[in-house]
Protein backbone atom coordinates (compact mmCIF):
# COMPACT_ATOMS: atom_id res chain seq x y z
CA UNK A 1 0.00 0.00 0.00
CA UNK A 2 2.78 2.43 0.92
CA UNK A 3 5.46 1.27 -1.56
CA UNK A 4 5.28 4.42 -3.73
CA UNK A 5 8.56 6.38 -3.65
CA UNK A 6 6.90 9.66 -2.70
CA UNK A 7 5.10 8.01 0.19
CA UNK A 8 8.34 6.37 1.30
CA UNK A 9 10.03 9.80 1.35
CA UNK A 10 7.33 11.10 3.66
CA UNK A 11 7.43 8.05 5.91
CA UNK A 12 11.17 8.62 6.22
CA UNK A 13 10.50 12.21 7.33
CA UNK A 14 7.97 11.03 9.92
CA UNK A 15 10.56 8.61 11.30
CA UNK A 16 13.16 11.39 11.26
CA UNK A 17 10.87 13.47 13.48
CA UNK A 18 10.66 10.57 15.92
CA UNK A 19 14.45 10.35 15.98
CA UNK A 20 14.48 14.02 17.03
CA UNK A 21 12.15 13.14 19.90
CA UNK A 22 9.06 14.63 18.25
CA UNK A 23 5.82 12.76 17.78
CA UNK A 24 4.64 13.27 14.16
CA UNK A 25 1.06 12.66 15.39
CA UNK A 26 0.76 14.96 18.39
CA UNK A 27 -2.28 15.45 20.57
CA UNK A 28 -3.29 17.99 23.18
CA UNK A 29 -2.10 21.27 21.67
CA UNK A 30 -4.97 23.77 21.42
CA UNK A 31 -5.66 26.70 19.13
CA UNK A 32 -6.85 29.99 20.60
CA UNK A 33 -8.66 31.26 17.49
CA UNK A 34 -9.96 29.92 14.22
CA UNK A 35 -8.30 31.41 11.16
CA UNK A 36 -11.39 33.44 10.34
CA UNK A 37 -11.58 34.76 13.91
CA UNK A 38 -7.89 35.73 13.74
CA UNK A 39 -8.43 37.63 10.49
CA UNK A 40 -11.43 39.42 11.96
CA UNK A 41 -9.88 40.23 15.34
CA UNK A 42 -6.69 41.68 13.88
CA UNK A 43 -8.08 43.24 10.71
CA UNK A 44 -6.80 46.62 11.95
CA UNK A 45 -3.19 45.43 11.47
CA UNK A 46 -2.60 46.71 7.95
CA UNK A 47 0.87 48.22 8.02
CA UNK A 48 4.27 46.55 8.23
CA UNK A 49 5.23 49.25 10.74
CA UNK A 50 2.54 48.17 13.24
CA UNK A 51 4.19 47.32 16.58
CA UNK A 52 4.95 43.60 16.76
CA UNK A 53 3.24 42.98 20.09
CA UNK A 54 4.40 39.57 21.26
CA UNK A 55 1.89 39.75 24.09
CA UNK A 56 -0.87 39.31 21.51
CA UNK A 57 0.11 35.71 20.86
CA UNK A 58 -2.46 33.43 19.27
CA UNK A 59 -2.37 29.78 18.28
CA UNK A 60 -3.87 28.73 14.96
CA UNK A 61 -4.13 25.29 13.35
CA UNK A 62 -4.82 23.81 9.94
CA UNK A 63 -3.52 21.99 6.89
CA UNK A 64 -0.56 23.35 4.93
CA UNK A 65 -1.90 24.28 1.49
CA UNK A 66 1.11 26.20 0.16
CA UNK A 67 4.74 26.32 1.26
CA UNK A 68 7.35 28.85 0.09
CA UNK A 69 10.85 28.33 1.48
CA UNK A 70 13.29 31.24 1.14
CA UNK A 71 16.61 30.62 2.84
CA UNK A 72 16.19 31.66 6.47
CA UNK A 73 12.42 32.24 6.30
CA UNK A 74 9.30 30.75 4.80
CA UNK A 75 5.67 31.63 4.14
CA UNK A 76 3.04 28.98 4.78
CA UNK A 77 -0.65 29.05 3.85
CA UNK A 78 -2.54 27.28 6.63
CA UNK A 79 -6.18 26.29 6.07
CA UNK A 80 -8.70 25.33 8.73
CA UNK A 81 -12.42 24.93 8.11
CA UNK A 82 -13.04 28.66 8.43
CA UNK A 83 -10.35 30.28 6.25
CA UNK A 84 -6.80 30.29 4.91
CA UNK A 85 -4.27 32.26 6.97
CA UNK A 86 -0.66 33.00 6.13
CA UNK A 87 2.07 32.16 8.62
CA UNK A 88 5.56 33.68 8.48
CA UNK A 89 8.27 31.51 9.99
CA UNK A 90 11.81 32.82 10.49
CA UNK A 91 15.05 31.23 11.64
CA UNK A 92 15.60 34.31 13.81
CA UNK A 93 12.63 33.29 15.96
CA UNK A 94 12.83 29.47 15.88
CA UNK A 95 16.59 28.79 15.60
CA UNK A 96 17.17 25.00 15.36
CA UNK A 97 13.43 24.37 15.13
CA UNK A 98 13.45 26.20 11.81
CA UNK A 99 15.99 23.73 10.41
CA UNK A 100 13.73 20.86 11.49
CA UNK A 101 10.75 22.54 9.85
CA UNK A 102 12.60 22.99 6.55
CA UNK A 103 13.66 19.36 6.67
CA UNK A 104 10.28 17.81 7.49
CA UNK A 105 7.39 20.11 6.57
CA UNK A 106 5.41 19.42 3.37
CA UNK A 107 2.16 20.49 1.77
CA UNK A 108 -0.68 18.52 3.36
CA UNK A 109 0.77 18.37 6.87
CA UNK A 110 -1.47 19.56 9.70
CA UNK A 111 0.25 22.10 11.93
CA UNK A 112 -0.12 24.47 14.87
CA UNK A 113 1.44 27.93 14.68
CA UNK A 114 1.73 30.18 17.73
CA UNK A 115 2.66 33.78 17.13
CA UNK A 116 1.62 37.41 16.90
CA UNK A 117 -0.28 39.27 14.16
CA UNK A 118 1.56 41.40 11.64
CA UNK A 119 1.23 42.62 8.07
CA UNK A 120 3.59 41.67 5.24
CA UNK A 121 5.06 44.17 2.78
CA UNK A 122 2.07 43.52 0.53
CA UNK A 123 -0.30 44.28 3.41
CA UNK A 124 -1.45 40.69 4.00
CA UNK A 125 -2.43 39.99 7.60
CA UNK A 126 -0.34 37.05 8.82
CA UNK A 127 0.80 35.32 11.97
CA UNK A 128 4.49 35.72 12.83
CA UNK A 129 5.52 32.35 14.29
CA UNK A 130 7.16 32.04 17.69
CA UNK A 131 6.35 28.32 17.91
CA UNK A 132 5.66 25.75 15.21
CA UNK A 133 4.44 22.16 15.63
CA UNK A 134 3.60 19.42 13.14
CA UNK A 135 0.44 17.86 14.57
CA UNK A 136 -0.13 15.24 11.87
CA UNK A 137 2.38 14.21 9.23
CA UNK A 138 0.62 13.32 5.98
CA UNK A 139 2.40 10.52 4.15
CA UNK A 140 0.36 10.61 0.93
CA UNK A 141 0.87 13.72 -1.26
CA UNK A 142 -2.24 15.71 -2.11
CA UNK A 143 -3.37 15.39 -5.76
CA UNK A 144 -2.33 18.04 -8.25
CA UNK A 145 -1.11 20.28 -5.48
CA UNK A 146 -3.21 23.49 -5.54
CA UNK A 147 -5.02 22.83 -8.84
CA UNK A 148 -7.91 20.85 -7.50
CA UNK A 149 -9.17 17.32 -7.97
CA UNK A 150 -10.79 16.84 -11.37
CA UNK A 151 -11.28 13.06 -11.60
CA UNK A 152 -15.04 12.68 -10.97
CA UNK A 153 -14.82 9.02 -9.90
CA UNK A 154 -11.97 9.75 -7.49
CA UNK A 155 -13.88 12.70 -6.03
CA UNK A 156 -16.78 10.45 -5.06
CA UNK A 157 -14.72 7.44 -3.95
CA UNK A 158 -12.29 9.49 -1.86
CA UNK A 159 -14.53 12.33 -0.71
CA UNK A 160 -11.96 13.38 1.90
CA UNK A 161 -9.62 14.38 -0.94
CA UNK A 162 -12.44 16.21 -2.67
CA UNK A 163 -13.12 18.21 0.49
CA UNK A 164 -9.43 19.01 0.98
CA UNK A 165 -8.76 20.38 -2.50
CA UNK A 166 -12.17 21.70 -3.64
CA UNK A 167 -13.48 24.36 -1.23
CA UNK A 168 -16.75 24.69 -3.17
CA UNK A 169 -17.62 21.10 -2.24
CA UNK A 170 -17.50 21.98 1.46
CA UNK A 171 -19.86 24.87 0.73
CA UNK A 172 -22.43 22.51 -0.84
CA UNK A 173 -22.50 20.27 2.22
CA UNK A 174 -22.66 23.20 4.61
CA UNK A 175 -25.65 24.43 2.63
CA UNK A 176 -27.15 20.93 2.77
CA UNK A 177 -26.88 21.02 6.55
CA UNK A 178 -28.57 24.42 6.62
CA UNK A 179 -31.37 23.14 4.36
CA UNK A 180 -32.02 20.11 6.58
CA UNK A 181 -31.99 22.16 9.78
CA UNK A 182 -34.27 24.76 8.15
CA UNK A 183 -36.75 22.09 7.05
CA UNK A 184 -36.75 20.71 10.60
CA UNK A 185 -37.27 24.18 12.09
CA UNK A 186 -40.12 24.93 9.67
CA UNK A 187 -42.08 21.85 10.69
CA UNK A 188 -41.45 22.48 14.36
CA UNK A 189 -42.79 26.02 13.92
CA UNK A 190 -45.84 24.54 12.19
CA UNK A 191 -46.52 22.41 15.27
CA UNK A 192 -45.22 19.04 14.04
CA UNK A 193 -43.48 16.57 16.36
CA UNK A 194 -40.27 14.90 15.16
CA UNK A 195 -40.28 11.13 15.68
CA UNK A 196 -38.13 8.12 14.82
CA UNK A 197 -39.49 4.88 13.40
CA UNK A 198 -37.79 1.54 12.61
CA UNK A 199 -35.15 1.23 9.90
CA UNK A 200 -35.57 -2.56 9.71
CA UNK A 201 -39.05 -3.75 8.81
CA UNK A 202 -40.63 -7.21 9.00
CA UNK A 203 -42.64 -6.26 5.88
CA UNK A 204 -41.40 -3.62 3.41
CA UNK A 205 -44.08 -1.05 2.69
CA UNK A 206 -45.00 2.57 2.16
CA UNK A 207 -43.78 2.75 -1.44
CA UNK A 208 -43.55 0.72 -4.62
CA UNK A 209 -39.89 -0.30 -4.59
CA UNK A 210 -37.59 -3.31 -4.36
CA UNK A 211 -36.14 -3.66 -0.83
CA UNK A 212 -32.75 -4.66 0.54
CA UNK A 213 -32.98 -7.86 2.59
CA UNK A 214 -30.98 -8.68 5.73
CA UNK A 215 -31.18 -11.33 8.45
CA UNK A 216 -31.67 -10.89 12.19
CA UNK A 217 -29.65 -13.65 13.86
CA UNK A 218 -31.19 -13.37 17.34
CA UNK A 219 -34.78 -13.44 16.06
CA UNK A 220 -33.92 -15.84 13.23
CA UNK A 221 -36.03 -13.87 10.75
CA UNK A 222 -35.48 -11.86 7.59
CA UNK A 223 -35.74 -8.11 7.87
CA UNK A 224 -35.97 -5.45 5.17
CA UNK A 225 -34.22 -2.08 5.19
CA UNK A 226 -37.05 0.37 5.03
CA UNK A 227 -38.15 1.73 1.68
CA UNK A 228 -40.37 4.32 3.42
CA UNK A 229 -41.51 5.10 6.99
CA UNK A 230 -45.10 5.79 5.93
CA UNK A 231 -46.96 2.90 7.52
CA UNK A 232 -45.28 3.39 10.90
CA UNK A 233 -45.93 7.13 10.90
CA UNK A 234 -49.60 6.50 10.15
CA UNK A 235 -49.74 4.04 13.05
CA UNK A 236 -48.74 7.02 15.22
CA UNK A 237 -51.68 9.00 13.83
CA UNK A 238 -53.93 6.08 14.81
CA UNK A 239 -52.34 6.29 18.27
CA UNK A 240 -53.37 9.91 18.73
CA UNK A 241 -50.50 12.06 17.47
CA UNK A 242 -51.93 14.65 15.08
CA UNK A 243 -48.84 16.09 13.34
CA UNK A 244 -45.60 14.12 13.03
CA UNK A 245 -42.54 14.17 10.79
CA UNK A 246 -39.38 12.15 10.34
CA UNK A 247 -36.15 13.03 8.52
CA UNK A 248 -34.18 9.88 7.88
CA UNK A 249 -32.79 7.38 5.38
CA UNK A 250 -34.68 5.15 2.99
CA UNK A 251 -33.15 2.25 1.05
CA UNK A 252 -34.29 1.01 -2.34
CA UNK A 253 -32.54 -1.80 -4.18
CA UNK A 254 -32.91 -0.27 -7.61
CA UNK A 255 -30.96 1.42 -10.38
CA UNK A 256 -28.70 4.43 -9.95
CA UNK A 257 -28.50 7.56 -12.08
CA UNK A 258 -27.90 11.29 -11.65
CA UNK A 259 -31.02 11.63 -9.47
CA UNK A 260 -31.22 8.20 -7.77
CA UNK A 261 -29.05 6.70 -5.04
CA UNK A 262 -30.03 3.44 -3.30
CA UNK A 263 -29.59 5.11 0.11
CA UNK A 264 -31.23 8.51 0.33
CA UNK A 265 -32.76 10.99 2.78
CA UNK A 266 -36.41 11.96 2.95
CA UNK A 267 -38.75 13.87 5.16
CA UNK A 268 -42.20 12.36 5.57
CA UNK A 269 -44.92 14.14 7.52
CA UNK A 270 -48.51 13.34 8.44
CA UNK A 271 -51.19 15.80 9.46
CA UNK A 272 -54.48 14.68 10.97
CA UNK A 273 -57.72 16.49 10.07
CA UNK A 274 -56.20 17.95 6.90
CA UNK A 275 -56.38 17.17 3.17
CA UNK A 276 -53.94 17.06 0.28
CA UNK A 277 -55.03 20.60 -0.65
CA UNK A 278 -53.72 21.72 2.77
CA UNK A 279 -50.41 20.03 2.00
CA UNK A 280 -50.10 21.98 -1.25
CA UNK A 281 -50.43 25.24 0.69
CA UNK A 282 -48.00 23.97 3.35
CA UNK A 283 -45.48 23.09 0.63
CA UNK A 284 -45.71 26.59 -0.81
CA UNK A 285 -44.98 28.05 2.64
CA UNK A 286 -42.05 25.67 3.07
CA UNK A 287 -40.40 26.80 -0.17
CA UNK A 288 -41.00 30.46 0.66
CA UNK A 289 -39.29 29.85 4.01
CA UNK A 290 -36.33 28.00 2.46
CA UNK A 291 -35.72 30.64 -0.19
CA UNK A 292 -35.74 33.33 2.49
CA UNK A 293 -33.47 31.37 4.85
CA UNK A 294 -30.96 30.63 2.08
CA UNK A 295 -31.13 34.20 0.72
CA UNK A 296 -32.22 32.93 -2.68
CA UNK A 297 -34.26 34.85 -5.21
CA UNK A 298 -37.70 33.59 -6.24
CA UNK A 299 -36.08 32.83 -9.61
CA UNK A 300 -33.24 30.32 -9.56
CA UNK A 301 -31.21 28.71 -12.33
CA UNK A 302 -30.97 24.93 -12.28
CA UNK A 303 -29.37 22.90 -15.09
CA UNK A 304 -29.68 25.91 -17.44
CA UNK A 305 -33.41 26.14 -16.62
CA UNK A 306 -34.96 29.18 -14.97
CA UNK A 307 -37.27 28.09 -12.16
CA UNK A 308 -39.70 30.78 -11.02
CA UNK A 309 -41.28 30.09 -7.63
CA UNK A 310 -43.72 32.93 -8.25
CA UNK A 311 -45.16 30.89 -11.13
CA UNK A 312 -46.36 27.89 -9.10
CA UNK A 313 -49.31 26.09 -10.68
CA UNK A 314 -51.76 23.26 -9.98
CA UNK A 315 -53.00 20.97 -12.77
CA UNK A 316 -54.80 17.62 -12.90
CA UNK A 317 -53.07 14.48 -14.19
CA UNK A 318 -55.24 14.14 -17.32
CA UNK A 319 -55.11 17.87 -18.07
CA UNK A 320 -51.31 17.73 -17.87
CA UNK A 321 -51.21 14.79 -20.29
CA UNK A 322 -53.47 16.67 -22.70
CA UNK A 323 -52.20 20.27 -22.51
CA UNK A 324 -48.51 19.61 -21.77
CA UNK A 325 -48.02 16.09 -23.13
CA UNK A 326 -50.04 16.80 -26.27
CA UNK A 327 -52.18 13.64 -26.08
CA UNK A 328 -55.83 14.08 -27.00
CA UNK A 329 -58.61 13.09 -24.59
CA UNK A 330 -60.06 10.50 -26.95
CA UNK A 331 -56.72 8.66 -26.71
CA UNK A 332 -56.25 9.20 -22.98
CA UNK A 333 -59.69 7.93 -22.04
CA UNK A 334 -59.45 4.63 -23.95
CA UNK A 335 -57.00 1.99 -22.74
CA UNK A 336 -56.52 0.31 -26.14
CA UNK A 337 -55.97 3.64 -27.93
CA UNK A 338 -53.49 4.76 -25.29
CA UNK A 339 -51.49 1.53 -25.60
CA UNK A 340 -51.43 1.86 -29.39
CA UNK A 341 -50.33 5.50 -29.13
CA UNK A 342 -47.47 4.69 -26.75
CA UNK A 343 -46.23 1.92 -29.04
CA UNK A 344 -46.45 4.25 -32.07
CA UNK A 345 -44.34 6.80 -30.18
CA UNK A 346 -41.67 4.21 -29.48
CA UNK A 347 -42.39 3.89 -25.76
CA UNK A 348 -41.48 0.41 -24.54
CA UNK A 349 -44.45 -0.88 -22.54
CA UNK A 350 -45.43 -4.32 -21.35
CA UNK A 351 -48.63 -5.57 -23.04
CA UNK A 352 -50.23 -6.50 -19.69
CA UNK A 353 -49.91 -3.06 -18.07
CA UNK A 354 -53.07 -1.75 -16.44
CA UNK A 355 -54.74 1.44 -17.64
CA UNK A 356 -53.35 3.42 -14.71
CA UNK A 357 -49.81 2.25 -15.41
CA UNK A 358 -50.19 3.13 -19.10
CA UNK A 359 -51.15 6.65 -18.05
CA UNK A 360 -48.08 6.72 -15.81
CA UNK A 361 -45.84 5.67 -18.73
CA UNK A 362 -47.33 8.45 -20.85
CA UNK A 363 -46.79 10.98 -18.07
CA UNK A 364 -43.17 9.94 -17.53
CA UNK A 365 -42.34 10.20 -21.24
CA UNK A 366 -44.31 13.25 -22.37
CA UNK A 367 -44.99 15.47 -19.36
CA UNK A 368 -42.55 15.24 -16.46
CA UNK A 369 -39.49 16.74 -18.15
CA UNK A 370 -41.54 19.79 -19.22
CA UNK A 371 -42.60 20.77 -15.69
CA UNK A 372 -39.99 23.45 -15.00
CA UNK A 373 -41.71 25.91 -12.66
CA UNK A 374 -43.15 24.38 -9.46
CA UNK A 375 -46.16 22.34 -10.59
CA UNK A 376 -48.53 20.38 -8.36
CA UNK A 377 -50.05 17.59 -10.45
CA UNK A 378 -53.25 16.27 -8.83
CA UNK A 379 -55.89 13.55 -9.30
CA UNK A 380 -53.63 10.56 -9.93
CA UNK A 381 -55.00 7.23 -11.19
CA UNK A 382 -56.08 5.11 -8.23
CA UNK A 383 -54.21 2.07 -9.62
CA UNK A 384 -50.83 3.71 -9.03
CA UNK A 385 -51.82 5.15 -5.65
CA UNK A 386 -52.33 2.11 -3.38
CA UNK A 387 -52.15 4.06 -0.10
CA UNK A 388 -54.05 7.20 -1.13
CA UNK A 389 -57.68 8.04 -0.42
CA UNK A 390 -60.16 7.42 -3.23
CA UNK A 391 -61.80 10.59 -4.54
CA UNK A 392 -65.44 10.96 -3.44
CA UNK A 393 -66.68 12.13 -6.85
CA UNK A 394 -64.59 9.85 -9.06
CA UNK A 395 -63.53 6.49 -7.58
CA UNK A 396 -60.97 5.98 -10.38
CA UNK A 397 -58.73 8.78 -9.13
CA UNK A 398 -56.92 9.42 -5.85
CA UNK A 399 -56.82 12.57 -3.73
CA UNK A 400 -53.12 12.79 -4.46
CA UNK A 401 -50.53 15.17 -5.89
CA UNK A 402 -46.90 15.19 -6.85
CA UNK A 403 -44.76 18.32 -6.97
CA UNK A 404 -42.43 18.70 -9.95
CA UNK A 405 -39.68 21.30 -10.25
CA UNK A 406 -37.08 21.56 -13.02
CA UNK A 407 -38.45 18.42 -14.65
CA UNK A 408 -38.10 16.21 -11.57
CA UNK A 409 -40.43 14.92 -8.88
CA UNK A 410 -39.63 16.66 -5.60
CA UNK A 411 -42.58 15.66 -3.42
CA UNK A 412 -45.46 13.20 -3.25
CA UNK A 413 -48.51 13.72 -1.04
CA UNK A 414 -52.10 12.65 -0.62
CA UNK A 415 -55.11 12.43 1.59
CA UNK A 416 -54.55 9.12 3.31
CA UNK A 417 -56.64 6.04 2.81
CA UNK A 418 -58.16 5.29 6.22
CA UNK A 419 -60.80 2.74 5.19
CA UNK A 420 -59.34 -0.60 6.39
CA UNK A 421 -61.49 -2.71 4.04
CA UNK A 422 -60.49 -0.67 0.99
CA UNK A 423 -56.84 -0.83 2.10
CA UNK A 424 -57.03 -4.61 2.45
CA UNK A 425 -58.39 -4.96 -1.10
CA UNK A 426 -55.68 -2.72 -2.50
CA UNK A 427 -52.99 -4.74 -0.75
CA UNK A 428 -54.51 -7.86 -2.32
CA UNK A 429 -54.29 -6.20 -5.74
CA UNK A 430 -50.64 -5.34 -5.08
CA UNK A 431 -49.92 -8.94 -4.11
CA UNK A 432 -51.51 -10.08 -7.38
CA UNK A 433 -49.27 -7.66 -9.30
CA UNK A 434 -46.23 -9.01 -7.45
CA UNK A 435 -47.21 -12.57 -8.37
CA UNK A 436 -47.31 -11.47 -12.02
CA UNK A 437 -43.68 -10.39 -11.75
CA UNK A 438 -43.87 -6.77 -10.57
CA UNK A 439 -40.96 -6.66 -8.10
CA UNK A 440 -41.90 -3.14 -6.98
CA UNK A 441 -45.49 -3.97 -6.03
CA UNK A 442 -46.24 -3.70 -2.32
CA UNK A 443 -46.49 -6.56 0.15
CA UNK A 444 -49.55 -7.48 2.18
CA UNK A 445 -49.31 -5.86 5.63
CA UNK A 446 -52.14 -7.19 7.76
CA UNK A 447 -50.75 -5.57 10.91
CA UNK A 448 -51.11 -2.16 9.30
CA UNK A 449 -54.66 -2.95 8.16
CA UNK A 450 -55.45 -4.04 11.74
CA UNK A 451 -54.10 -0.68 12.99
CA UNK A 452 -56.35 1.16 10.51
CA UNK A 453 -59.29 -0.88 11.76
CA UNK A 454 -58.91 0.87 15.12
CA UNK A 455 -59.71 4.16 13.41
CA UNK A 456 -57.36 6.68 11.80
CA UNK A 457 -58.68 10.24 11.57
CA UNK A 458 -58.83 11.94 8.17
CA UNK A 459 -55.16 12.59 7.48
CA UNK A 460 -52.89 14.02 4.81
CA UNK A 461 -49.31 12.86 4.34
CA UNK A 462 -46.37 13.85 2.19
CA UNK A 463 -42.78 12.93 1.43
CA UNK A 464 -40.04 15.21 0.09
CA UNK A 465 -36.71 13.92 -1.19
CA UNK A 466 -34.06 15.88 0.70
CA UNK A 467 -31.27 15.02 -1.74
CA UNK A 468 -33.20 16.29 -4.76
CA UNK A 469 -34.23 19.35 -2.77
CA UNK A 470 -30.57 20.07 -2.02
CA UNK A 471 -29.68 19.52 -5.68
CA UNK A 472 -32.30 22.07 -6.68
CA UNK A 473 -31.28 24.71 -4.14
CA UNK A 474 -27.51 24.34 -4.68
CA UNK A 475 -27.52 23.84 -8.45
CA UNK A 476 -25.90 20.38 -8.20
CA UNK A 477 -26.34 18.32 -11.37
CA UNK A 478 -25.86 14.89 -9.79
CA UNK A 479 -27.20 13.38 -6.59
CA UNK A 480 -23.63 12.20 -5.94
CA UNK A 481 -22.67 15.86 -5.51
CA UNK A 482 -25.00 16.28 -2.51
CA UNK A 483 -24.38 12.92 -0.76
CA UNK A 484 -21.05 12.81 1.06
CA UNK A 485 -20.41 9.13 0.35
CA UNK A 486 -22.63 8.01 -2.55
CA UNK A 487 -22.99 4.39 -3.65
CA UNK A 488 -20.31 3.43 -6.17
CA UNK A 489 -19.56 0.32 -8.19
CA UNK A 490 -16.79 -1.65 -6.42
CA UNK A 491 -13.31 -1.38 -7.92
CA UNK A 492 -9.97 -2.82 -6.92
CA UNK A 493 -8.03 -0.02 -5.27
CA UNK A 494 -4.32 -0.23 -6.03
CA UNK A 495 -3.68 3.03 -4.15
CA UNK A 496 -1.66 4.51 -7.00
CA UNK A 497 -0.86 8.21 -6.68
CA UNK A 498 0.58 10.90 -8.86
CA UNK A 499 2.90 13.09 -6.90
CA UNK A 500 1.82 16.65 -6.27
CA UNK A 501 5.39 17.47 -5.31
Swiss-Prot record:
What is written in the cofactor note of this entry? Answer: Binds 3 Mg(2+) ions per subunit.
Listed as disulfide-bonded, the cysteine pairs are none
Q: Name one Pfam family in it.
A: tRNA-synt_2
Q: Which PROSITE patterns match?
A: AA_TRNA_LIGASE_II
Where does this protein hold Mg(2+) 1?
A: 402, 409
GO cellular component terms, alphabetically, are: cytosol
Give an example GO molecular function.
tRNA binding
Q: Name one GO biological process term.
A: lysyl-tRNA aminoacylation
| UniProt keyword annotation of Amino-acid biosynthesis present | no
Q: Which Gene3D superfamilies match?
A: Bira Bifunctional Protein, Domain 2 (3.30.930.10), Nucleic acid-binding proteins (2.40.50.140)
Its subcellular locations are: Cytoplasm
Annotated protein name in UniProt? Lysine--tRNA ligase
Q: Which organism is it from?
A: Helicobacter pylori (strain P12)
Amino acid sequence: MFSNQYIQQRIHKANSLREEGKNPYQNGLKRSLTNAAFLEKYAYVKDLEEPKDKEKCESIVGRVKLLRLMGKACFIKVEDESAILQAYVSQNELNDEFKSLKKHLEVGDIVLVKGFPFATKTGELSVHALEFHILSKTIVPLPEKFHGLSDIELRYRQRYLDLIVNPSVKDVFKKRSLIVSSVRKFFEMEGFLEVETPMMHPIPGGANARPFITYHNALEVERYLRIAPELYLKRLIVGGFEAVFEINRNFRNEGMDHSHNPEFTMIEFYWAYHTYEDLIELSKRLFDYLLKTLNLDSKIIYNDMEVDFNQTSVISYLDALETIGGISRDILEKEDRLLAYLLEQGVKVEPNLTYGKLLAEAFDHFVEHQLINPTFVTQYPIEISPLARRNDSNPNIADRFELFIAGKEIANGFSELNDPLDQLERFKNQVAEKEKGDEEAQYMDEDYVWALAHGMPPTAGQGIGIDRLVMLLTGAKSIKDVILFPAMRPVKNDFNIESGE
